[in-house]
């Protein structure tokens, strides 16, 4: 059970930890007293089946959940439980994306059922643990458990590349992460800024996505589209080191990407990547698109693959492995 003073503490649920973000006063009491009173939240379960298609990531899955469930308060104040056979196809980083954005779903937390991947991930990082110790500590649902929010099946094969659009506050449509839309149905949306990174999309796997798209574009003789500023922010020093070791940093720089050191950035309206005027359009891998939060412009949330592909085409574009080779 982990509590910390960050709204996205819940991304720790990827490793089967129960994780809450709390306020500074509550956290101070926790540190002083070494215990906390917690009301057990209601739960909602998402049963994942199948595997994602090329061009889709866990970000598209959570955008789908925001659109189809959180929009109607199905996830409000509940623990979002992710399980089912399809979960095995998602890496630990991808599971972290799901749990991270439980916050945007207005949920209490997000947690993934543990499996062999969980064990392997922990053993790689904790020399003091054994497989038996980890298994004994697994947090699993009771058999025949009742879910106040219900059990909802999500077929990963049916997930399509998505965005959360900025809405139109002047017409009564608020800017909100629950404004889901399929990319192939929004028409041509030209962009000024492509922003990749943040706690949601600055992990090892996310950077492998950015590098894959960038390499494909460079191999096709392309660079970041004219009139587009592309930023990639490292999620941590460890991720930055990995990028340098794998040669990804060189790829990004060759393509014209502007790199940013780890830290909270455009998500909170700080640093490079923030829009300057209401006419600017940003496609971003961050987790929130509330009006004014990342500058006065319009902000579309999307997956790491979509953000990077869009940086090279100059408009919001879903990634496909052959998109650049086909001209």
Q: How would you label these PLM feature ranges?
A:
Residues 1-327:
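Fe-S-dependent hydro-lyases/dehydratases of central metabolism
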